Amino acid sequence: MKRYHLSAGFVVIFVLLFSSCKPEFSETSRYQIAFYNLENLFDTIDTRDVRDTEFTPGSEKQWNSGKYERKVANMARVIKDVGEAEDFEAPSVVGLCEMENRDVLEDLVGTPALDDYGYRIVHENSPDRRGIDVALIYRPDLFKMDDYRAVPLIIEDESGERIYTRHQLLVSGRLGGEEIHFIVNHWPSRYGGEEQSRPFRKAAARLSRSIVDSIRSEKPDAHIIVMGDLNDDPDNASVKDILKAGVGPQSAESDSLYNALAPLFFQGKGTLCYRDVWNMFDQLILTPGLLKKEKGKLFFEKAGILDHEYLRQQEGDYDGYPFRTFVGDWYHGGYSDHFPSYVVLKR
């Protein structure tokens, strides 16, 4: 019987060649991009220079490790269920808001529900006085990040004092090998009244629009998804006039964007409810290049909201509303005061 002797050098070359055959991205023809407002995912530690004392054990909320761990597990369950609602194991990319820091994000992606997917985190602490941030998590088998930056939103009150709020997070990379950009937002709230706070959201819209225009000035057909809790609806001026997010599909050359959640809003659906009126604050807005159906290229397939029964209040004055963690200082033990929203892309 012949014996074959392989040199060490040959073995190394063989291993390198074999490993190079492994695809950079998992093979799939569909991708899900989601957004979720986590409704105050805070740890239990009183952090210096951050107004987070209400989420500590000695506060009126009596926030503690048990409640925190339940909250993290709840958020992870919802994120996984967003994927399963569209026959994914878990979403490809998820934009997030209302979390305190990177530590809580590490706990989130390390839960049993999400740990298998190896989610990576894009996050920077924002200057928001409450300490709440925006972030993006992604599956590295489906998305490869090339770069990111936090773009500050500079706004001032009537006396000229700066209002410290969330930045906008721009994350650029390749989804299934195709270049794409995500802009994760949490625009200023309606605290103090919708009309009085309106200029701040218009300023946020101008910033988002300037980021989009900057990218498209170099690549007009760039794939961009603006996502976030905008604290405005699709028919508010900040969204439809300044951001130029239309309610109908746009031509590839159009200056307008496509608001993928707007059709659901005009059907009476929403991601949060206030005084029995549904709002669609949690939106995903696409550049027109994602509306072109070209073979082998990413394009928009559908949009949706995850509003399963377990995510809804089942009784009382708020029957049917999102089942939230707190109502004031009363611990409700639910999930979030927002439903998650998403889009599906395919090629």
Pin down the residues of each PLM region.
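Second-shell loop/turn segments in exported
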Residues: 57-68, 90-96, 123-124, 157-159, ...
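N-terminal, active-site-proximal structural segment of metallo-dependent hydrolase catalytic domains
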Residues: 21-112, 122-134, 311-320, 346-347
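Active-site-proximal beta-strand/loop segments in catalytic clefts of secreted hydrolases
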Residues: 36-39, 97-100, 123-127, 139-140, ...
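Bacterial Sec-dependent N-terminal signal peptides
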Residues: 1-28
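Structured beta-strand-rich core segments of catalytic domains in phosphoester-bond hydrolases
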Residues: 99-179, 185-187
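Metal-dependent phosphoester-hydrolase catalytic domains
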Residues: 21-23, 214-224, 232-347
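Extracytoplasmic, non-cytosolic globular domains
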Residues: 123, 169-264
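Extracytoplasmic/secreted cell-surface and envelope-processing proteins
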Residues: 103-106, 130-133, 191-194, 233-238, ...
